[in-house]
Amino acid sequence: MMGGNMNKMMKQVQKMQQDMAKMQEELGNRTVETTAGGGVVKVVASGKQEIISITIKPEAVDPDDVEMLQDLLITAVNDALRQSQEMVAKEMGKLTGGLNIPGLF
């Protein structure tokens, strides 16, 4: 009797692994977009927490105030990465039933 339960559990684990691999691939193709400075800096990040693009409008480039542009970039990049992590956590939570399993993504 125990063998049947073990086989069933192993099949469930394998299915969850397959579902997770599929979700990771799908999330890698999804993106989040954020802006800073009223839209003068735009950052797009993937579900893999990789920066896809950074767009800077010309009015953000002031040779006398490079620090402002640097601050806008840091803000936008950090926000994009945070949003990407939240997107991944939300989607993985659906798959794992809310269980927080370290190292999933």
Curated annotation (Swiss-Prot):
Coarsely, its chief localization is cytoplasm
GO MF terms, alphabetically ordered: DNA binding
Pfam families in the cross-refs: YbaB_DNA_bd
What InterPro entries does this protein map onto?
Answer: YbaB-like_sf, YbaB/EbfC
GO CC, any one term: bacterial nucleoid
The entry's localization annotation reads: Cytoplasm, Nucleoid
This protein's record includes keyword DNA-binding: yes
Q: Which cysteines are joined by disulfide bonds?
A: none
* Gene3D superfamilies per UniProt: Nucleoid-associated protein YbaB-like domain
Q: What does this protein do?
A: Binds to DNA and alters its conformation. May be involved in regulation of gene expression, nucleoid organization and DNA protection.
**HAMAP family named in the record:** DNA_YbaB_EbfC
Per the record, the similarity remark reads: Belongs to the YbaB/EbfC family.
Cite the PANTHER family for this sequence. Answer: NUCLEOID-ASSOCIATED PROTEIN YBAB
Question: What is the official name of this protein in its record?
Answer: Nucleoid-associated protein Dred_0043
Which species expresses this protein natively? Desulforamulus reducens (strain ATCC BAA-1160 / DSM 100696 / MI-1) (Desulfotomaculum reducens)
